[in-house]
Curated annotation (Swiss-Prot):
It comes from Maize mosaic virus (isolate Maize/United States/Reed/2005) (MMV). The lineage of its organism: Viruses, Riboviria, Orthornavirae, Negarnaviricota, Haploviricotina. GO terms for cellular component: membrane; viral envelope; virion membrane. Glycosylatedby host. Glycosylation is crucial for glycoprotein export at the cell surface. Homotrimer. Interacts with matrix protein. The chain crosses the membrane at residues 553-573. This is Glycoprotein. One of its GO terms (biological process) is virion attachment to host cell.
Amino acid sequence: MSLIHLIYFPTILSLILGTEGTPALTYGNLADNQHGNEEQGDVDMYPLYECSKKGAGVSSNNWYGACRGACSMTKNTTDVHMEIYYRNDSVGWIDVLSIQTTEIWKHSHVTWYGECEHNTKYGSSNTAPVSVILERLEFLHNGMSSWPYGHSIHVHDTISSPDCSYFDDVSRSGWRLIISKRALELKSDIAGEGYIVDPDVGYVYPVADGIGKGRTWHVWKASSVPSSGCYFKSAGITNCTLLMDTFLYSCPSLNIAFSARVGKHIKSTCVGDMNISTDGVTYQTLGSTDQGSISTQLVSLWHQSQEALIQQLILTINEALGKIETSYCESTCDLTEMLISQHTEHPMVIETPVGPWLPYSIDGKVSVLPCQGGQDLVVIKPIEICASPFMLKVKSLKSLDTYWWVPTDSHVAPFTQCSNRDDEEMIIKIQRKKPLIFEFWRGAYKLDYPYNSSGIWLDNPGGHIHRSSKWFPTLDSLSYSSPINLPLISKGIRKHIQAIVSTTEITSGGNVTSWTHSISTIAEAMFDSAAIAAGRVVMWWYTLEESVKRYLTVAFGLVLTVITIWAMSKLFFRSSPTYARAPTNIEWVRS
């Protein structure tokens, strides 16, 4: 399997107008002998779309109904002025006391000398009854503001040592509370009720309870919920069209369409009364207007004209234009639905009359994810690279979220993750001195051996992304407020490759020019897997900070010194061999 797969789709525009799209540079793997131009400073590298989590998708049938409904020019429509919200799961932080409890027994005893002795015995760590914690809530709340965070432990016994009695030993039983303080994230559910998640076992505690039981007891002040933290955050105020044939709200300005059926009505939230649709969208209706059909609106507008003939002429022309426009729009929906139904493992974002969408499939069922087309995604500097598969780290300037971007895609999504594995195919190509090709949706970047100079850019004439207005497909030029061009990205790629090259064979005239290669060559002659392991160790060393390298060098030197001293001591101080004592009487033998 190649390092990266390059897959492009023809544009909707070429399908609608019947023209042949410009073919892509290649399909699948790019050839090693492909030629191109030197790096171009004006080739900007960005994903265009930010797509949602897979759980936010809608079925292809619902999407198709919303798309066709948006094309209706002759049916009566109702415009609803509404505000759309999304859940602001994290609304702040709250101080929580974690309380570990142990059963204890305290005894008093009078000695033979008349002294009073006290001692304490401890049982195993058990969870105390809730009554023990509730009886000391005031004490715990008072200490919450003064006790430090972290693992600083405050110990509190629920009983004191009993007074001594001259007639008998006295015993009491109770509990020892070992208390630590930390701040936990305060979250909210869909109904706007705050809750806390136990980080140890994952239990969920309603914030209004003030107490929760997991492996230990947890206590917090229910009244300490941040007043500024609202459970819902506005996604925007917009006009949505109620499509009666599918009973969906279509909100083109927010790129969203959802069911008009109310699944749940919530009262008195932090933003007022709200509706939750059957497909999970939270919104408030601010008013509605019956718009009627386009023709009806034109008649009411032009009724003020005294020229009946001109009025009729304008009406006729606009009805004709409306039918043409509707035809184009519905064709776009039909063709897009066909592309969605032919979902592949490497789909593209498709612009539609109801916004951009990304097809995906789960258990054989095709759905689409809503995407945002705002040009606010930038490549992070310094460049961060994932080796397998090849990805770049990007950041949203609006939400400040970071994503791993597969450069062959025009979109990013939160479910794309880096595996942090070395790419074996790339290592083999480096060992064979083959060109390395990094593919993007607008072309490919080719880096020739020895990988220490500027590469070349292979333009992809078919790498355009279909972008449309609400009705007619158009191709818009791209513009960015913070441009990141190819040289900046290629510099990061070359730096990443050099880290790999330092562990592979780099020869010049038969002489080894890298000391790290000697390790790799000897190991490879013995066993291939050992060579790869040694190379990875050296690559790991190459990526360490200088300060870390110094500490490790000192530690290794100390270990080596200790071993050497031990070996020398064994050599010089080993015991001498035993010798038998010579006899004192010598018997001479005479001939």
